[in-house]
């Protein structure tokens, strides 16, 4: 039976356990994802408490991390989503995304509406990908793809 959570406490605690086990076993999120049939971004989000994993994927990941049956069950529950408090993020990486939306949020909104009309980009029917590429000027660049289904507003 599908279960859902009413608070973030249990999944936050499990996320801490996952991160510690991942570090102890020196595993990457890509290694944890192997064999699940899911994307690295989705599995990572699930392990950090933002998605439910299918039963087989939950078992595969839990076995790699040495987690118990309760953790397997918890990984399958629908979480209470949202990991950022109602304040400006202080983590530098998360803050940069916040800053990007502060600077480009209205631009993204204007361009999406101009190209698609009134509506939203789904975060449910959604794909996320992060790639590291060489910068021709030296160093590396992060290429982040946000791929969401467009959902038009329907008058009623």
Curated annotation (Swiss-Prot):
Signal peptide stretch: none
Family: Belongs to the cyanase family.
UniProt-listed InterPro entries: Cyanase, Cyanate_lyase_C, Cyanate_lyase_C_sf, CYNS_N, Lambda_DNA-bd_dom_sf
Keywords: Lyase
Protein name: Cyanate hydratase
Catalyzed reactions: cyanate + hydrogencarbonate + 3 H(+) = NH4(+) + 2 CO2
Active site, per annotation: 96, 99, 122
Source organism, top-level taxon: Bacteria
Functional note: Catalyzes the reaction of cyanate with bicarbonate to produce ammonia and carbon dioxide.
Listed EC numbers: 4.2.1.104
Native species: Burkholderia cenocepacia (strain ATCC BAA-245 / DSM 16553 / LMG 16656 / NCTC 13227 / J2315 / CF5610)
CDD domains: Cyanase_C (cd00559)
